[in-house]
């Protein structure tokens, strides 16, 4: 039985093929590294303390040292992990040299080739996305280009230095986080002004032609995952270590990128406010209320729960005295929580139904069926991903609240 969960097209078939052809092997024996031509490392690099820009590189450094102990002349080592700019040519190079007794750039090649994939699109992304590769010297760069070029079917390899590749990866995720924050902030503005964010978004997106586009992303209940929640801090740490003395920036002003992180981290708290507002209108106390939380994964149609924004929301509602039942069709287990076995059991008796994940199963929620399951005259529905038709639920007596839906969030309650 495959251990893969969620929707990952082609991955299971490809794994089965290479296993059957004996081209794929899992092992904990690091001595086998000595028989390889190239080694790639893709190990998580979280932060111990984001405020102090202190990353937890312990797992990555352990992996690097294990490679170094088994390194032989002529090999290529590639770091695929997202790392602070300067790591490949700095600490990684030093550790490999210390453990192997070899010299980076002379006895072995060393490069950075950051992964650029999304859960749910792994194989397609690997084959079709351009691949940034950067070595600590021209020979290392050329070796990395040679390694990755055959994998790409549509994308091309873009060579640069190792540090430039590190900045590219951290900056592309930082910029996406910034784009999401812009959408989230505008959604909050639209709620405050009583207008529909999605009307405004459509108007903004209509400006095209002559190379101009102002396409906006969608707002939502929060940003999760392993990458966007930390890569801003890798970039900030990189500029502090490599170029802080030369950085010309408005004095005593916070980083725009860090501010974007703050906005995105705020969105689960805004979902708490929307929930409490709805419960207040229904004359239901938060203390003792039952909340049906739909979605524990941070990404639509995925089982990836890393840094899920559902968690701070759940914690805040429990701290306020509510009971929270969690459902996710893709997640079998999550530390510290009990997942409900069915959507029906999750919603049964709920005072509020709160949508956190954009799973396709939640797009077909029927207001009549949901209301019957809750048993409430005026149940609350809070839509954090623009999944449902507000009017359909309002017409059935629901109290609706939604991210960016200032046009609906103050609707009169219908009997």
Please annotate each region the language model reported.
Residues 1-415:
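Structural/interface elements that position substrates and couple domains in central-metabolism enzymes
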